[in-house]
């Protein structure tokens, strides 16, 4: 029926503002399309492992929001950039994260299209909010590693265009990093 994405969006907005709404909508749509997996979580008692999983998923989602922005910076989705993200997810988070990450990215691309139709600055505002949350919750070193990942996405197709460079500088500033750090990585 598609109700999970709207419920997730509303709850996400109440809990985390615009970024929370986007995250809730995307995660809710995953439940809508994959309802067999959604039922497996009922009845589980919260444990330390589920707290870690929640933190991991929160970081993974923020990372993918930023990755989607860099991938689409030049107006197209390149196979080489998507393949770079798949390899990174596989080596960092395991095979299960590859499919989950790809679904999230595809949902983010679709969400961006819808947001851009209503307000061309809406997704950019989401990126700013995401960067602010990342700056508040990650150490300098972790933010720098995330920036390296984003720069490598831009480089993965063999050419870093001006739009990608500007998007990288923008993301760096939102995450509390210097534009010079982006320039040194290119």
Question: Language-model segments: what does each one mean?
Answer:
Residues 1-72, 76-186:
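Small-residue-enriched hydrophobic alpha-helices in membranes
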């Amino acid at each position: 029926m598609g109700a999970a994405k709207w419920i997730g969006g509303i709850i996400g907005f109440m809990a985390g503002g615009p970024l929370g709404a986007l995250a809730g909508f995307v995660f809710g749509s995953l439940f809508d399309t994959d309802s067999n997996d959604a039922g497996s979580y009922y009845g589980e008692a919260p444990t330390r492992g589920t707290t870690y999983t929640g933190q991991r998923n929160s970081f993974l989602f923020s990372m993918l929001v930023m990755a989607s922005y860099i991938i689409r910076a030049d107006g197209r989705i390149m196979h080489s950039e998507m393949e770079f993200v798949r390899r990174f997810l596989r080596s960092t988070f395991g095979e299960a994260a590859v499919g989950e990450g790809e679904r999230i990215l595809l949902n983010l691309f679709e969400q961006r299209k819808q947001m851009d139709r209503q307000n061309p600055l809406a997704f950019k505002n989401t990126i700013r909010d995401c960067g602010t949350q990342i700056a508040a919750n990650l150490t300098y070193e972790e933010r720098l590693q995330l920036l390296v990942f984003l720069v490598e996405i831009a480089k993965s197709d063999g050419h870093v265009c001006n739009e990608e460079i500007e998007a990288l500088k923008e993301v760096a500033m939102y995450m509390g990093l210097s534009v010079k750090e982006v320039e040194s990585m290119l």
